């Protein structure tokens, strides 16, 4: 296996773990919360009727994450949205390992500072089990995407799944990793 320098993973191991052990009085290093995976979801309403649009967004999400997305299908028919069961309605990527750490670094240090009118992440977006969710309204904040190559603006939901038992532990984990939260 190729070892690769990942700044955020090294920061986690050398700085964040000791801080969390001290703050929450953990006796064992295995008690310290860590990030398990990141799930990126992109709902594409027109994707069910426009295969070309779906493929363009599929390539964009693959460029952003470095991994091929899975096409999500509708679980049931909804007549108001003109959706039938089994239609393509979105894209999903689950990142683990090196790609996860690289994506986290990119989000915290490159993407979030480029978001227009960004004043920090909402600290109330934890789910009660230590997982954090937030959304981006456009994909152009990623350096891999330029506005002229994309057919339309498309947002995405990002879920950071941690092993933290409480929201306070997960908040401190993400804060020590450099995520900008509102005060």
From Swiss-Prot:
Cellular component terms (Gene Ontology): ribonucleoprotein complex; ribosome
MF (Gene Ontology): rRNA binding; structural constituent of ribosome; tRNA binding
Pfam families: Ribosomal_L5, Ribosomal_L5_C
Keyword Methyltransferase attached: no
GO biological process, one term: translation
Key words, A-Z: Ribonucleoprotein, Ribosomal protein, RNA-binding, rRNA-binding, tRNA-binding
InterPro entries assigned: Ribosomal_uL5, Ribosomal_uL5_bac-type, Ribosomal_uL5_C, Ribosomal_uL5_CS, Ribosomal_uL5_dom_sf, Ribosomal_uL5_N
Entry similarity comment: Belongs to the universal ribosomal protein uL5 family.
Subunit record text: Part of the 50S ribosomal subunit; part of the 5S rRNA/L5/L18/L25 subcomplex. Contacts the 5S rRNA and the P site tRNA. Forms a bridge to the 30S subunit in the 70S ribosome.
Role summary: This is one of the proteins that bind and probably mediate the attachment of the 5S RNA into the large ribosomal subunit, where it forms part of the central protuberance. In the 70S ribosome it contacts protein S13 of the 30S subunit (bridge B1b), connecting the 2 subunits; this bridge is implicated in subunit movement. Contacts the P site tRNA; the 5S rRNA and some of its associated proteins might help stabilize positioning of ribosome-bound tRNAs.
NCBIfam families hit by this protein: PRK00010.1
Descriptive protein name: Large ribosomal subunit protein uL5
Native organism taxonomy: Bacteria, Thermotogati, Thermotogota, Thermotogae, Thermotogales
């Amino acid at each position: 296996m190729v070892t690769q320098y990942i700044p955020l993973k090294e920061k986690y191991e050398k700085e964040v773990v000791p801080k969390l052990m001290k703050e929450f009085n953990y006796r064992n290093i295995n008690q310290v919360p860590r990030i398990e995976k990141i799930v990126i979801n992109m709902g594409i309403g027109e994707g069910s009727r426009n295969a070309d649009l779906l493929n363009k967004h599929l390539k964009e999400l693959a460029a952003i994450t470095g991994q091929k997305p899975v096409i999500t299908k509708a679980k049931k028919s909804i007549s108001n949205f003109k959706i039938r069961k089994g239609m393509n309605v979105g894209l999903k990527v689950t990142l683990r390992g090196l790609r996860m750490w690289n994506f986290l670094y990119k989000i915290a240090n490159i993407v979030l500072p480029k978001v227009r009118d960004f004043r920090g992440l909402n600290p109330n977006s934890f789910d009660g089990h230590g997982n954090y969710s937030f959304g981006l309204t456009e994909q152009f904040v990623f350096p891999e995407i330029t506005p002229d190559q994309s057919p339309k603006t498309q947002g995405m939901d990002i879920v950071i799944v941690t092993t933290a038992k409480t929201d306070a532990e997960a908040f401190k984990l993400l804060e020590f990793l450099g995520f900008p939260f509102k005060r």
